């Protein structure tokens, strides 16, 4: 009897320890939560926002350094536009942009330069519909908010916001003013990525389960050209994936993020910083002991519907350029780097459209002939319309032109834009959320629902077209 009682007590003690340990373990691994501010009264979301048609889209450009002049050049080729104003801190940059207009046979635009607040005067004009912002990162959000407050739609270079506070300001201003706030993410218009998106939408890969994306681009040849060294300075002071949008954009569109699914939790980790401090030592002679941004940052994300994403950032080490675009479906696979390839079950293609379809298998890439046939069949309608012109005009192989053209097209036809302010938020929030994860031992971090309840209102990502 004593032995039975002793065994019972031991069993209860072990059960109590196990329960206590499980409770502690559960508490230990609860995701870090960040605040989601309540939507202000009398304010609605801007999902599928449409605004009155614009016969002519009148634009003003702020920032004419590395990206701005190319945008001005592209807009000279887009019908239904008028370049009204040009702004940069340096007067010579404005003059160089004026020469682009002159070469295109267009009238001179109003000039704003030489004053750090000159951009506000551009935003305050009453003859501009869109303010196109291509400055350094730290000015993006403030300029976007000010432009919307003065009745303008805004198009902001990547990343459009660097903190959650900036993101919420852009969201609330867009919702309050009912103005479009689009991030200028060009990679979603890449020919392979847009074709693969169309294939995913038509079920070629089966249910998409996992996607990958990245910005892998050694910038050692480019660092000297950033105004006042702003980009290296930002990397020196900030940890985390500070430039995630090129990988995030195509990945989120394939997974229908805030169009039937949402990002729920992320975990991030980074390597130590080696090349950043070495570059500063080589270029300035100064020792840097607290360089924040690791040479490589890796992030894993899980969605509400049980899908996963892998995102990388590396601008420091020697590696071939890559956005690491991959789509992993239950019945097929797409990958852009290092070579463009597909892998499909034979059941996923029509024998009338694809040669030698019976030779397809689930463990090897399709042949070049099959790949060409697939890309021809599933070429996106946007590319069917614009590919020839886009490749002539240029801008990262044409995708920059398509990005700008689609912005103008949607505004002229009163359609929802291809990318809304919630896309901007989801792709830019990686900067702060990955830092939070890394600084807390790679702990899970909850991703806010930037739509504040509207992520499931639209089912599936789609481009809008005029009837």
Curated annotation (Swiss-Prot):
Cofactor field: NAD(+)
Binding site for NAD(+): 66-67, 88, 137-140, 157-158, 186, 243
E.C. designation(s): 3.2.1.-
InterPro entries hit by this protein: Gfo/Idh/MocA-like_OxRdtase_N, Gfo/Idh/MocA_oxidrdct_glycsds, Glyco_hydro_109_C, NAD(P)-bd_dom_sf
Keyword NAD found: yes
Any Pfam family hit: GFO_IDH_MocA
Domain of life: Bacteria
UniProt GO MF annotations: hydrolase activity, acting on glycosyl bonds; nucleotide binding
UniProt KW keywords: Glycosidase, Hydrolase, NAD, Signal
Residues that bind substrate: 215, 231, 243-246, 321
Cofactor binding: number and manner: Binds 1 NAD(+) per subunit. The NAD(+) cannot dissociate.
Region forming the signal peptide: 1-22
Keyword RNA-binding: no
Job description of the protein: Glycosidase.
Family: Belongs to the Gfo/Idh/MocA family. Glycosyl hydrolase 109 subfamily.
Protein name: Glycosyl hydrolase family 109 protein 1
């Amino acid at each position: 009897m004593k032995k039975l009682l002793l065994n019972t007590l031991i069993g209860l003690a072990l059960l109590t320890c196990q329960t206590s340990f499980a409770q502690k373990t559960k508490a230990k691994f609860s995701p870090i939560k960040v605040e989601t501010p309540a939507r202000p009264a009398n304010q609605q979301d801007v999902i599928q926002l449409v605004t009155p048609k614009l016969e002519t889209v009148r634009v003003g450009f702020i920032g004419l350094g590395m990206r701005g002049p190319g945008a001005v050049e592209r807009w000279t080729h887009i019908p239904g536009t008028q370049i009204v104003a040009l702004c940069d801190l340096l007067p010579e940059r404005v003059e160089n942009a004026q020469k682009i207009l002159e070469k295109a046979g267009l009238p001179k635009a109003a000039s704003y330069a030489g004053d750090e607040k000159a951009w506000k005067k551009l935003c305050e004009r009453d003859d501009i519909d869109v303010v196109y912002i291509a400055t350094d990162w730290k000015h993006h959000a403030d300029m976007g908010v000010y432009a919307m407050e003065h009745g303008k739609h805004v198009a902001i270079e990547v990343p459009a916001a660097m903190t959650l506070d900036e993101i919420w300001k852009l969201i609330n201003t867009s919702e309050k003013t009912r103005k479009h706030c689009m991030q200028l993410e060009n990679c979603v218009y890449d020919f392979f990525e847009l074709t693969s998106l169309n294939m995913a939408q038509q079920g070629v890969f089966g249910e998409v389960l996992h996607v990958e994306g990245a910005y892998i681009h050694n910038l050692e040849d480019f660092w000297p050209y950033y105004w006042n060294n702003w980009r290296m300075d930002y990397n020196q002071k900030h940890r985390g994936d500070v430039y995630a949008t090129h990988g995030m954009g195509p990945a989120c569109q394939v997974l229908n993020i805030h169009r039937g699914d949402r990002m729920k939790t992320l975990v991030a980790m980074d390597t130590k910083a080696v090349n950043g401090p070495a570059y500063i030592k080589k270029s300035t002679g100064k020792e840097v002991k607290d360089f924040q941004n690791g040479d490589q940052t890796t992030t894993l994300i899980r969605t509400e519907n049980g899908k996963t994403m892998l995102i990388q950032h590396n601008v420091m080490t020697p590696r071939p350029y890559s956005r690491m675009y991959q789509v992993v479906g239950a019945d097929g696979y797409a990958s852009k780097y290092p070579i463009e390839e597909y892998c499909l079950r034979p059941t996923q293609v029509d024998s009338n459209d694809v040669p030698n379809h019976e030779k397809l298998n689930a463990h090897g890439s399709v042949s070049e002939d099959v790949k060409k046939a697939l890309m021809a069949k599933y070429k996106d309608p946007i590319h069917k319309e614009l590919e020839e012109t886009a490749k002539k005009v240029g801008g990262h192989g044409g995708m920059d032109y398509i990005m700008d053209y689609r912005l103008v097209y949607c505004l002229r036809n009163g359609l929802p834009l291809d990318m809304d302010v919630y896309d901007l938020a989801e792709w830019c929030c990686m900067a702060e959320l990955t830092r939070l994860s890394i600084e807390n031992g790679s702990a899970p971090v909850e991703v806010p629902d930037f739509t504040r309840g509207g992520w499931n209102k639209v089912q599936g990502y789609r481009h809008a077209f005029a009837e």
